[in-house]
Amino acid sequence: MTSARRPAAPRQNVVLTASAMLAATFAISPAAAQTPNDDFARRQAQQAEQQRLETLGRMTPKPAQAEAQAPAAAGGKKTGPCFAITHIEVEGVGQFSAAAIDKVTAPYANRCVGVGEINALLRDLTHLYLDKGFVSSRVYVPAQDIAKTKVLRLVAVEGTLSDIYINGKPAPGSGVLATAFPGMKGEITNLRDIEQGLDQINRLSSNNAKTAMLPGKTDGTSILNVENKPEHPWHLSFGNSNLGQEQTGYSKSSASVGYDNLFGINDQWNFAYEHSGPDYPWRDDGLGKSNSYSGNVSVPYGYWTFSANGSWYEYDSSVPGNFGPLQTSGDSKQLGVGADRVIFRDKDSITTLNSGLTYKETNNFLLGNKIEVGSRKYTVGDLGISHSRRMLGGLWVFDLSYSQGLNLFDAVAPGDAGAGDADPRFSKFTGTITMTRPFELASQRLEINSIVTGQYSPDNLFGAEQFSLGGYSTVRGTRETMLYGNNGFFIRNDLVWRTQPFAGNAELAKMFGEFRPYVGLDYGRIASQARYRIDGGDMFGWTVGGKLAGGHVNFDIGYSDIFGGTVDRHDSGLLFVSTSVRW
């Protein structure tokens, strides 16, 4: 009993000594002082980036069918009588410069042209409009005496949009139409504007909208009809995987709820909860536990999409100490806003500007005492550009972004205890290229999925801002994140066999989707930086597995391992299982 009461003063010394040691670790090298807070922040950023690029890929226009008949060349075969023409006038043009029109008409001027060539000229001018997305515009030949004037007069009717219907009926007060197609009534009908608005409506998973053009009430006008029969607006998802880490438990369980069009303005709401811990009935499945809560909302307005997001994360774990394990804990929160703008789209591609502002706060504790070196507030501004394109038989997405630490919202200053040796006013560049290439082999549907991601910063970064390798989302083959640094890259490649074993049963196909066996090969490298005590290194990983995807039930099982590189590990490969059910 006496010995149980006496450790009060020694325990205080243990706390102070351990705190000093941990503080020194944080101060010396953020890369060596990674916490569950840092891992959660990186994972959140990776998931948000993946979701954004997947959404951009889905919005990229599908390949159009080839034209059945190409426009005739100006020098083609003459049919019937020809007319001597000195020049050509095109009236009613408001969307193109005189030089653009002259480029099309010049080959037909100062020559004798027949009816076939006049029709070819009409097609060329019409295609000029179609290539810009002006699908309801046309060019025709008015009554005239060409033989007398030697001038060919043409008239362009630049069709305008008089109204927008939903399911064949006017919808004057519709917030759905107001946010998807703002300012389009009375303007020239532009297919790109229609595609953009349709993408904004179908951004919500409950929608499956299609559009059709109806004749307007006056000449030269059209009505856009949006056909949509939304499914239930709410969405639920539950899942579990064994992809957690030792510090916070191997079991990761999640639940999420979403709601579409809550306020009738194409708004999308999502809330999620995730818990990790040693929750499996067997031993050796981690030490600590964690809980996270997150939410986001997005609202479109034509070519703009505005968003807000937030998250809260907390963990309890332990670290080795001289006298036994030491209890650690921490929490972090994040609040952000964003604005994306589609700046260009055509029949093959979309280009988007992305911007965001995020406030981040992190607290870490040892034996209940706050570790100042590992606790901080900081703010990051982001600006980027994304481009998706269908080319070379596949879908390509390119993304480049710049992040800057800002002196906003009580952000930690350089040299403060919370900053350690990291620079709170850091700058960093990140780039990503993804490629999805379907092909057939022996009548089987196969697909290659590749991603290359890299990061560069001239500064020393907080752990949450660093680049990491290891775990399921980067170089596969380990449960834990193995390498950290300010600069690095990784490459992931998957060969997927897309089978449809449930194609003969509509209900089973809806429930389970496709079965997709796959093999993967990954490589990543972290650059060494001696001045920041970052050793760097590289790692190779391989994966083999199979998944159910595309239905209400998603299931992924496989095995991955490291087969090369500089990482020092003592465990064997990872057998992983992940499952989720959504409605």
Model-predicted segments: where are they?
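Periplasmic polypeptide-binding modules associated with outer-membrane biogenesis and secretion
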Residues: S3-A4, Q34-G244, S256, E274-N291, ...
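Transmembrane beta-barrel strands of outer-membrane/channel proteins
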Residues: M213, F238-N242, A255, W269-H275, ...
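Residues that define the transmembrane beta-barrel architecture of outer-membrane proteins
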Residues: G220, G249-S253, K289-Y293, D331-L335, ...
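Extracellular loop and loop/strand-boundary signature of outer-membrane beta-barrel proteins
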Residues: S241-L243, S276-R283, G321-L326, F365-V373, ...
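Transmembrane beta-barrel wall of Gram-negative outer-membrane proteins
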Residues: Q268, W282-I385
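Outer-membrane beta-barrel "beta-signal"
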Residues: V257, G546-V553, D571-W583
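C-terminal outer-membrane beta-barrel translocator/porin domains of Gram-negative envelope proteins
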Residues: N363-F515, L521-Y523, A527
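Repeated loop/turn-to-beta-strand initiation elements of outer-membrane beta-barrel proteins
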Residues: W234-L236, F263-W269, G302-A308, D346-T351, ...
